[in-house]
Amino acid sequence: MRFANRDPFDHNVFSASDSNQFDLERYGRGETRAHTFAHPGLVRVFCNIHPRMVAFVQVMSGRLFTQPASDGSFVISDIPPGAYTLRVWHERSPEVTRDVRVTAAGAVGVDVELDARGFRWVPHKNKYGEDYPTNEGLERY
């Protein structure tokens, strides 16, 4: 995955996720750094300079996945007939699962509702395992 810096200030992209830890060190505007994820799973990605910069990467081991359209609809094509567990994830909602049976006809409708009412921002530690310095009111981004 490539992490491009198009901002007029430096970044330091890192993750302390168990099986996919990495640190791209500090890099400036116009630079791009890359990382190859070794294991499937959720990777929380942060910037060691900007505590509110957060990204989530779902590393998948198979080909049966998708990202929904802006209206929430999604399609996963070319699924062989059989029984499957659909897993739906969003950073602000608990994961939702549905058992799905795909027939030879293919098309299956599934309704999924995510509930983000319990979401709370939780501060994370920097790449050294320490709190970020308090700069409230001094941010320039």
Question: Where are the regions a protein language model picked out?
Answer:
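Extracytoplasmic copper-binding redox domains, predominantly the cupredoxin/blue-copper superfamily
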Residues: M1-Y141
